[in-house]
Amino acid sequence: MSPELWNPVLRQLTIGWSYEAWDVPTGASMSAVRAKLLQTDVVAANVTMPHKQWAAGAADTVTDGVRLSGAANLLVRRDKQLEAHNTDVSAVTALHGDRAERHAVMFGAGGAARATLVALNGRAARVTIADRDPEASSQLLELAASLGIDAMAATWDEAQRQAPEASLIVNATPLGKSCHDEPVWGKAGLAEDAMVYDFVYAKHVTASIASAQEQGLRYADGWDHLREQAAAMVPVLGMPPRTGLLLERTLGMIHGEDAGVGII
């Protein structure tokens, strides 16, 4: 997704930059990756799972979002040092706004969920976390405790039962990438003041977002998140102000094509 989004924009800006995809498989020499990032022809790098926590630790300086979440999705080269940012936190903050949540139910406990938890700091009275991997849930609970957030782990079924009374539902899993998937919380109706935040982006409208639309609820989907995530990079990289508009136009064109499916 990132080369498709950024390269048309960079060509229009005529600043001499290009966006390349690097495949960094699990088990690769991360010291070699870090050394490559410090080469003088590198401006910055987006980092995807499963390397977001590595990126936070590999940086010389970090933002508050990285320090709090323990994850980074953007490394910027500043001379011979790396500066870590978490634009997932920025995107969730922008899209969620200043809502106060009485109860947030989060499906998934990976990097996207960590960013969401940081963005909700001070704005959620209670959080329920459900993940197929108990260890991932445990790690997210530790983060919640460090932030002073009242959180509990639940089984998938328990979280689905709690969802109808929640004010925020977060899908930080791949559920929805298939057009045959159900909403992440099941088929139940949600509270009239609920918001649905779905990290999945796809050519089709995901089941979770379709249900939110049918119920007249506020929502943010994976395309919204991609837009805000990219917009957050613009000032960090010192790019021209018109970059944001170019990104939005390019993302709109990609959304209208068969751009595949993904989760941030």
Q: What are these model-derived regions, one by one?
A:
Residues 22, 130-132, 197:
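The conserved SAM/SAH-binding core of class I Rossmann-like methyltransferase domains
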Residues 18, 102-103, 125-128, 150, ...:
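Residues at the starts of beta-strands that form the adenosine-phosphate
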Residues 147-220:
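Rossmann-like adenosine-cofactor binding region
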Residues 1-99, 203-205:
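Phosphate/diphosphate ligand-binding glycine-rich loop within oxidoreductases
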Residues 86-89, 96-121, 131-136:
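Glycine-rich adenosine-cofactor-binding loop
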Residues 195, 199-264:
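Adenosine-phosphate binding glycine-rich loop
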Residues 124-147:
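NAD(P)-binding Rossmann-fold cofactor-contacting core
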